[in-house]
Amino acid sequence: MQEEEGNLEELVYFYPPSTTPPAVGKYTQLISDLLQSVSIVDALPGGAAQAGVLCQDTKEVLERENTVLEIAIPRQDNLVIVGDIHGQFADMLSNVLSIQLNLNNSKATDGRGSPSTEIYKFLFLGDYVDRGPQSLEVITLLFALKVEYPEHIFLLRGNHEEAQTSRLYGFFQECKSKLEGTGDRGPASVDITSSTWLQYNTVFCWLPLAAVVACPSGMFFCTHGGLSPHTLSVPLLKSLRRHEYGMVDDFEDTFYTPTSRGGDDMLEGPGAKARLVIDGLLWSDPEDQLSGCQMNNRGCGFIFGPDVTRSFLDRNYSYGFPPSKRQLIGEMKPGMQFILRGHQCAREGYMWCHGGLVLTLFSAPNYCGMHGNKGAVALLRGQVQAGKDRVELEFNVYDTVVTGGSDNLVACLSPFAFAHYFSGDS
């Protein structure tokens, strides 16, 4: 492992290096700086060029992961599940990542009086960028953590990790204003094919689309949005060519757009059903008073009823978790118990629907500086699950640490995108 140059005593590590060392040591300084709220311009002194190297390293890590992650949480492990962040960097630091950072600073001991080796793994459900003022800080820190701790930090894709969306709702403009023309890049470029924004979006295409989490008390399915009429089984999801969805052409300002945005011919053409499945995973919403699926009024994805959820969970009741990972868990209760997703602002930070079969988690408190909602994360403690018949989650609910109102949103959105906020995607 090659550590970065500098005074190691001044570094803030996300995990204790004695028990969970960084995988490559290339981004320890960057992580330390961002954990201490150093300006992104100072944290990335190489500017756009340095960000591009981080994007390439992250892409190489993600390419080795499956489209559907399989995350085992045995008795000795803990998992923090995180909903939408939307550029609210201060809240992510203070309310989400602080769960592990505070543990690092505690004097906790194990049952024998030795320093505790307890750590938290993290599963993020997507929507890291857009809306909030510090999307670049959020995604840069998460990418660096992913490279250094690939078996502890898991990142799923949200509907805002897609070029057409992030072009409109703030991330594109933020990349240009904060990094273009900095460091070794020289003057800012107007060509989107060479922009920092494009490099981040290339990585977005490789983010996994879903995860199955297994622990002693059972399994549950995680994704950003939800289901579609074609989302039948987890094994089929594994064959999706996720990197082809939402790509930006390398040489032209064109987008491979989601296919469910209207039109009678939306099921025609090769791969159309696969794209509809991905539309659902990223864009769909549950609805209690509905049977089956309907087109979503967001303009993409679907609204799905409790019967669709029950059918999906029943079809995947006997999902075959990999033997090597199941062995880590030991005795495990059977069954796919519920769906955990983000994508919708929840007044109390989380909400159950479909008779307790769908859980929505939202981790951006006072969303856009105007909604007044709580934020929440879910905690899965492996030790607690032992001997239980069903998965039991704990919830950390919190208020924003940011003072002020909607200026936090307007600061990073163009007038065109801001107008879209009130009329389109929510």
Regions found by a protein language model. Name each.
Residues M1-S426:
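Feature recognizes metal-dependent phosphohydrolase scaffolds
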